[in-house]
Amino acid sequence: MKFPTDLIEGRLVKRYKRFFADVELADGEVVTAHCANTGAMTGIKTPGLPVWLSRSDNPKRKLKYTWELVEAEGTLIGALPNLANSLAEEAVNAGVISELTGYDSLRREVKYGENSRIDLLLEGNDRPPCWVEVKNVHWQRGPGIAEFPDGVTSRGAKHLVELANQVQAGERAVQLFIVQRSDCDVLRPAEDIDPVYARTLRDSAAAGVEVLAYACEVSPTAVIIHRPMRVELSQ
């Protein structure tokens, strides 16, 4: 997925109140950018890190800038979790995610479960519907190892239970992790951060939910899903 405009490089001054980040630009000006990542952002919110911003000239916006990328541990990382759904849709349509090919239609945000909306619903070609829940991952905890989540997510565990229910109903369900960095080969649940989520992920996989992970190539011009990763669920 290409960025529609050129990104602006700066240095992170601080991230605060979840939605805001102060960034020093190359000319010394400090601007406030919208931070669309409301999570813990573990490892990618350290003051001084290089960051990239997009700029909007929409007069209705309170903040002109949006925090898009960050460089940590020598690697560019996508900072927008909500981009993961669009990346997944683009990759499915392009046939990049081989496990999710062969369907006639793709819909987003379809209601299911208990007041939930599935990220992607694949249908058609005389196949059972395929319910795909997408989770964004940015956190590297060891060389080549990405982990999720970086904070407790009861909502994420709820989604896994709902995916398992779809399998029980005779349909297909997939938990898809989009890792917005290129330096990881393995995806693991962060057992110490959220043991309930880790256990629920293993239980749902045992019940037939497919667990996939894909890494991205990240640059100041685009973020693109490009290769599968190994998933390790054992403790």
UniProtKB/Swiss-Prot annotation:
It holds the Pfam family SfsA. InterPro entries: SfsA (IPR005224), SfsA_C (IPR040452), SfsA_N (IPR041465). GO terms for molecular function: DNA binding. Disulfide bonds: none annotated. NCBIfam families: sfsA. Belongs to the SfsA family. This is Sugar fermentation stimulation protein homolog. It comes from Maricaulis maris (strain MCS10) (Caulobacter maris). The lineage of its organism: Bacteria, Pseudomonadati, Pseudomonadota, Alphaproteobacteria, Maricaulales.
